[in-house]
Every structure is written in C-alpha cells, then in structure tokens.
Amino acid sequence: PTLDEVLQTIPNGRKIYIEIKCGLEIISPLLNQLSESSLNKDDVVIISFDAPVIKALKESKPEYKSLLLYSCEDNRNIDELIDDALKINANGISTDNESSQLLVDKILSSGLEYHSWTIDDSEVARKLIQWGSSSITTNDPKSLIQKI
C-alpha cells in the first residue's frame, strides 16, 4: 500500500509510528502527505536512527513528535546519546533495551520520553512498562496485550 492508503486506515485517536529509513530527501514529501491526511498531528510519531533527519523534521514541523532510534548494540555513551537527542529537539529516544533500568531512568530524567522496540516477550514488556516506557513496538500485539 501507499503511505496515503496506510494513513487512511488509522482510526481516530490511534497513533502511527513512521520510520524514516532514508535521508533528508523524504522530509518534504512526507510532510506534504501528512498535511493532506485527516490525521491529527498528535497521532503521528516520526522515528529514525538518523539524527539529521529528526533535526530537519523538527525544524520544518516541530509539532510532530519524533524519536531518535538507538540500538544498544552500538554501545554508545548514554549521556552523549541524550545530549544528541536534546540538540536535535527529539521528543524522546526509542531503543531495543531489555535489561537496563539505568538507561531508561537517565533518558526519562533528562525530560525525554522513552520508547521500546521490538519486544515480543511479555515479561520484558511488563518490566519496561514499569520502568516508564511510553510505547512498545512488537511483532505480535494481540498476544502481548493478552499476556500483560
């Protein structure tokens, strides 16, 4: 399906997370598509591993929520990651963290939101919710919801 077709399927009050996997060239066409859709800006979350993409998005349309994606395999200094997210005006950081409450606490104490991906284990999901994760991306939402 096209992005426009997908946007039309999102029920009122539900969120869509759009991951940008390419570069800056997508920002303008994406924002045009979003502005033509009937979605409320509060229901759109843009996510990317690419800090310049998030920065450009926030400079163009700061009202859209954005999350900087981070893979724990990258083993970055968390304070530097938080500083980078704050510099580009990201609303939060989303990681594949399953075991570090300290990481979650540091992100939340900086004023940023914390989000989780891709979590399919209900015990891990329950723990991340207790730690303060605002959202959890999963491959099996129905099963995960039933278990937690």
What is each stretch, according to the model?
Residues 68-148:
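C-terminal active-site rim and adjoining tail of enzyme catalytic domains
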Residues 1-74, 88-98, 108-110:
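Metal-dependent phosphodiesterase/phospholipase catalytic core, i.e.
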